Every structure is written in C-alpha cells, then in structure tokens.
Design a protein with these regions (language model features):
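Sec-dependent N-terminal signal peptides of Gram-positive bacterial secreted proteins and lipoproteins
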Residues: 1-19
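Compositionally biased intrinsically disordered regions enriched in Thr/Gly
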Residues: 14-239
Length: 239
C-alpha cells in the first residue's frame, strides 16, 4: 500500500461545491479499486468545517453515496448550536484527520473549537465517523465489536490515554458505567439532543480509539487507544 500526499495551492472551485480545494491524498493498493481523498470545506459566516470527499472509485454510485454520507456526518457538529451556522455570534473551526484509509474502512476524526459570543467559555468539539467501503454506510462501534463487561475490563487494562492527564480516568468508572458509554458510541444523529452521547470511536491501522466526553476543565473530551491485537476475541469481523 502506498499513500502519497500532494499539496495543492491556489486552486479554487465554485462555492456550490463547498469552497477551495486545499489538499489531495491518494491511496493506492493492489486491489481492484483505488480511490483518492480530497479536502473540501463548508464555509458560512465564521463557520469553517473541513471534510474529505472520494474520487476515483470504480463504483460511481457507491462513491456518490459515501460522499453524501461523509458531508452530512461532518456537518452534524452544527446541531450543537440552536440555529446551526446561522447562530448569532458563532465562531466554529473544525478540521478533519484521516485515521485509517484502506480497501475496507475509512475512519475520520473531526476536532476543533466552537464559541458563541457572550457564553462562559468555548467548546472543544471532537467527533468521528467510520465507513465500510464495501457498502458506503457509516458503521458504529457495536457493529464491529462485541460490547460486554469483559470488553470494558480489557479496555481499562490495555488502553492508553492520549493525554497523560487522563491516565487512570477509565479506572474510575465501573465496568457497567463504561459499558453503557460504549453502547451509546457513534450516535451522530443524536448530536444536539438533550440526552446526546459524547462517546465516539475511530480506527487506525493497528488500534481502536475511543473518545469520551469529560468536563470542560478536563478538555471536554478524552481519547484512549487500545491495540487491535488486544481485542481480537471481541471483534465481530477481522480488521
């Protein structure tokens, strides 16, 4: 597998297709289907959200479906605000990172800062979306992993906090409480609801990442990663 990054400058595209083209990430493999990821932006007033779009897939209908789903999911962060991008005094800057890109999975992380003038403090946003390249659908943690108390215990023992300040955080949760959080993971469709879940998952080449909402003083979100090899008994399919 070869991943090639090419930076493009001064290439503009019509606003109707979401702004300027800034970068190109090309994925090649020895499979029958190659694809490229290109960074696009949603802009409105002081709101900027970057998200990837695919090109070069052999199956154009699947590519169209994926691109529509990716953009829709990227913009769900707007549901945190009562009037979305039209919210008075809103400044929002969200960037995306490709966590995994192969013939089976595309896993995307979004993070950034949102602030409404006059509020006590800005919000550190973090959310993710993972797609099966075989059917173009977004897939949640519980569709890939058997979630039970044994998995919760394994996550507590084997995972590492990405922030040293959050080491030991999972140990402070009972297996039942941690399991309840994991079972609600990846519910992008509930963002903005009263009982929304702030738990998300992502995949890298060798790990599963879990993001859990925490207090603003702790950074609003905390991430933990566990090696895929350590959770093989819980996987519903090889990854």
């Amino acid at each position: 597998m070869i991943i090639l990054y090419i930076l493009l400058a001064c290439i503009s595209m019509p606003q109707s297709i979401a702004g300027d083209l800034n970068s190109l990430q090309t994925h090649s493999s020895n499979t029958h289907e190659n694809y490229q990821l290109t960074e696009f932006f949603y802009h409105h007033n002081q709101t900027a959200i970057s998200y990837p779009q695919l090109s070069g897939m052999n199956d154009s209908s699947k590519q169209e479906k994926l691109n529509k789903n990716i953009k829709t999911d990227a913009l769900t962060v707007l549901h945190y605000y009562p009037d979305g991008a039209m919210t008075d005094g809103l400044t929002l800057d969200i960037k995306h990172t490709i966590k995994r890109m192969d013939r089976e999975l595309l896993s995307i992380q979004y993070d950034g800062l949102g602030n409404v003038s006059g509020t006590a403090h800005p919000s550190n946003h973090f959310y993710t979306s993972t797609y099966l390249l075989t059917d173009g659908e977004r897939i949640k943690l519980d569709q890939l992993v058997t979630l039970n108390e044994a998995f919760a215990e394994t996550l507590k023992k084997k995972s590492k906090a990405l922030s040293p300040a959050m080491e030991g955080y999972l140990d402070g949760l009972s297996n039942q409480d941690l399991l309840a959080k994991l079972q609600s993971a990846d519910q992008l469709e509930r963002i903005g609801e009263k009982n929304q879940s702030d738990v998300f998952s992502y995949w890298t080449e060798d790990s599963l990442g879990i993001s859990i909402g925490v207090s603003h003083a702790q950074g609003d979100h905390a991430e933990f990663e566990v090696k895929t090899k350590d959770i093989i008994p819980f996987l519903k399919k090889p990854l």
